[in-house]
UniProtKB/Swiss-Prot annotation:
Record text about domains: The signal sequence and the kringle domain are highly similar to the apolipoprotein(a) precursor protein. This protein is however much shorter and does not contain any peptidase region.
Listed GO CC annotations: extracellular region
Transmembrane regions listed in the UniProt entry: none
Protein name, UniProt field: Putative apolipoprotein(a)-like protein 2
CDD domains (alphabetical): KR
Organism phylogeny: Eukaryota, Metazoa, Chordata, Craniata, Vertebrata
Sugar-bearing residue positions: 101
Subcellular location: Secreted
Domain Kringle: 27-105
Length: 132
């Protein structure tokens, strides 16, 4: 069997192989979280964050247009005003804002952790086809 055929078979096998997602590690922030740029969007009480560009249900002045350097993307938790930690406006009409359910990083942790994706790799012997 030619090298090209082996490579093609291996690529086809890998493409059809299922992927497994490893365990997720909770995101964390340093200091007061002003530099936090993760994608967490849930408050300490479990409420969903309102998008920074939205005025519903809460009108506010912290928009991405007015504060372009504060990372006010989507509805992600941020700290654009030097509060004690990352926060957001909530989608609950009765609760204007809350701190986010994030923890401060310990000294040996990074700012954002991403879940690992594991792709099983078959042995090369399984990819060979005997040709008579």
């Amino acid at each position: 069997m030619e090298h090209k055929e082996v490579v093609l078979l291996l690529l086809l096998f890998l493409k059809s192989a299922p992927t497994e997602t490893g365990p997720s590690v909770q995101e964390c922030y340093h200091s007061n979280g002003q530099s936090y740029r993760g994608t967490y969007f849930t408050t300490v009480t479990g409420r969903t964050c309102q998008a920074w560009s939205s005025m519903t249900p809460h009108q506010h002045s912290r928009t991405p247009e007015k504060y372009p350097n504060d990372g006010l993307i989507s509805n992600y938790c941020r700290n654009p005003d030097c509060s004690a930690g990352p926060w957001c406006y909530t989608t609950d009409p009765n609760v204007r804002w809350e701190y986010c359910n994030l923890t401060r990083c310990s000294d040996d942790e990074g700012t954002v952790f991403v879940p690992l994706t594991v792709i099983p790799v078959p042995s090369l012997e399984d990819s060979f086809i005997q040709v008579a």
